[in-house]
């Protein structure tokens, strides 16, 4: 039995798409368990670059089962647009290789409208949402007024729930935000058509995933975003609306914790963040710009420039602790090549006291000053390295120190964007 989690150990954008794609080679099933089409990752295979947002990365392989779990919020329009995009790239998506949970909640047009309107209303206190309707959909889920995929398969149930929701949503949209109301008939027609298209893909994914694990198949659970965007343990309120830590697999895919055998945290060799919120190691100078351009740090979904800084092992230690990580996969080592001195944050100075954890209060985190260790950099390109021994000596010293500081082994090192730019150091 083998069921393992792949998730982001920082603020997202760590290279999960590439690493999930690589690890999916040895998996039979790939499962998304939280988030929605607000996630964005790029996978490069030979001369093609695939940009995925919702469909699991295993779709790029033949004979893999890909699952959109119950913890995902599903925008059916976005899903079928991605299906068509993949077909245009030569990737077939069928009910045989993509299964959608009947319990997943649906993102509705009013969710997207409310997402954008509430963000605009916040003004300078905006969160930095992608505007995809993720948060409002999870809000309805928590309020128990959400509409699920299974409702689409029962048109009369869907119509009644849509009518009830629209009465409230239209009141908010028109009276609070001064926007035009949504038309019931238009949404009804559009979504019932989606229901017909979705029907062949819809199953009870919990039963399928459970049986696959029980029968000895390898199941990979693919996280979206990153540990510090977790709704409970991230840098709240600048977080996403779901549980992105390892434990989120259990409710998001409906399996028990004892079925998980390992968890791999994906981390860049430096740190990036999109949007607002404290960022202790952020570099607001030429070095930050250099890392951004060398690593092409711009969002797949939004195109926004990412904030860049030195590696923060306080963040990685927290990820290892709260997600039960058994190893790290380090990406973007190649981006640091050519830098004379490389720094790593080993702790924070908080009002004169050294701490090695992330305070819950953002006001306290903003007062934390990074305590650095400095390392000699490496001029050699690492792109041609295909084994750990072929890496530059200083790069290996850098990675070894990360293992010591986080008390977690590094199982994989990525030296470039393509599948073959991957070095397996140990078993995951």
Curated annotation (Swiss-Prot):
Its EC number is 6.3.4.4. Keywords: Cytoplasm, GTP-binding, Ligase, Magnesium, Metal-binding, Nucleotide-binding, Purine biosynthesis. Its cofactor is Mg(2+). GO terms for biological process: 'de novo' AMP biosynthetic process; IMP metabolic process. Its main location: cytoplasm. GTP binds at residues 12-18, 40-42, 306, 332-334, 414-416. The active site is at residues 13, 41. InterPro entries: Adenylosuccin_syn_GTP-bd, Adenylosuccin_syn_Lys_AS, Adenylosuccinate_synth_dom1, Adenylosuccinate_synth_dom2, Adenylosuccinate_synth_dom3, Adenylosuccinate_synthetase, P-loop_NTPase. Transmembrane segments: none annotated. GO terms for cellular component: cytoplasm. IMP binds at residues 13-16, 38-41, 130, 144, 225, 240, 304. GO terms for molecular function: adenylosuccinate synthase activity; GTP binding; magnesium ion binding. It catalyses: IMP + L-aspartate + GTP = N(6)-(1,2-dicarboxyethyl)-AMP + GDP + phosphate + 2 H(+). Binds 1 Mg(2+) ion per subunit. It is found in: Cytoplasm. The keyword Cytoplasm applies. SMART domains: Adenylsucc_synt. Substrate binds at residues 300-306. Mg(2+) binds at residues 13, 40. Pathway: Purine metabolism; AMP biosynthesis via de novo pathway; AMP from IMP: step 1/2. It is an enzyme of class 6 (ligase). Belongs to the adenylosuccinate synthetase family. Plays an important role in the de novo pathway of purine nucleotide biosynthesis. Catalyzes the first committed step in the biosynthesis of AMP from IMP. Homodimer. This is Adenylosuccinate synthetase.
């Amino acid at each position: 039995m083998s069921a393992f989690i792949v998730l982001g150990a920082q603020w997202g954008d760590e290279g999960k798409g590439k690493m999930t794609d690589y690890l999916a080679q040895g998996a039979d099933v790939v499962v998304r368990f939280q988030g929605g089409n607000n996630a964005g990752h790029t996978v490069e295979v030979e001369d093609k670059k695939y940009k995925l947002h919702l469909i699991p990365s295993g779709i790029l392989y033949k004979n893999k089962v890909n699952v959109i779990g119950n913890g995902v919020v599903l925008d059916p329009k976005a899903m079928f647009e991605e299906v068509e995009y993949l077909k245009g790239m030569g990737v077939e998506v069928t009910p045989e290789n993509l299964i959608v949970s009947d319990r997943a909640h649906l993102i509705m047009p009013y969710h997207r409208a409310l997402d954008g309107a509430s963000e605009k209303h916040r003004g300078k206190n905006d969160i930095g949402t992608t505007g995809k309707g993720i948060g409002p959909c999870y809000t309805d889920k928590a309020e128990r007024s959400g509409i699920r995929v299974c409702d689409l398969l029962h048109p009369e149930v869907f119509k009644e729930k849509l009518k009830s929701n629209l009465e409230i949503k239209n009141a908010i949209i028109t009276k609070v935000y001064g926007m035009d109301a949504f038309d019931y008939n238009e949404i009804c027609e559009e979504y019932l058509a989606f229901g017909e298209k979705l029907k062949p893909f819809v199953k009870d994914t919990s039963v399928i995933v459970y049986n696959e694990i029980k029968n000895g198949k390898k199941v990979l659970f693919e996280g979206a975003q990153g540990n510090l965007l977790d709704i409970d343990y991230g840098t709240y309120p600048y977080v996403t609306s779901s549980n992105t830590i390892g434990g989120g697999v259990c409710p998001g895919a409906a399996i028990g914790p004892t079925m998980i055998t390992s968890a791999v945290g994906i981390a860049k060799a430096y740190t990036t963040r999109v949007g607002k919120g404290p960022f202790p190691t952020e570099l607001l100078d030429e070095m930050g710009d250099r890392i951004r351009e060398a690593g092409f740090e711009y969002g797949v979904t939004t195109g926004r420039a990412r904030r860049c800084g030195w590696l923060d092992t306080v963040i990685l230690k927290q990820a290892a602790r709260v997600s039960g990580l058994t190893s790290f996969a380090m990406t973007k080592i190649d981006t640091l090549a050519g830098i004379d001195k490389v720094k790593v944050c080993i702790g924070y100075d908080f009002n004169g006291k050294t701490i090695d954890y992330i305070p819950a209060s953002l006001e306290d985190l903003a007062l934390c000053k990074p305590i650095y260790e400095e390392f000699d950099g490496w001029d050699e390109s690492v792109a041609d390295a295909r084994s750990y021994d072929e890496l530059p000596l200083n790069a290996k010293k850098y990675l070894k120190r990360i293992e010591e500081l986080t008390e977690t082994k590094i199982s994989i090192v990525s030296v470039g964007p393509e599948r073959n730019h991957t070095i397996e150091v140990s078993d995951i």
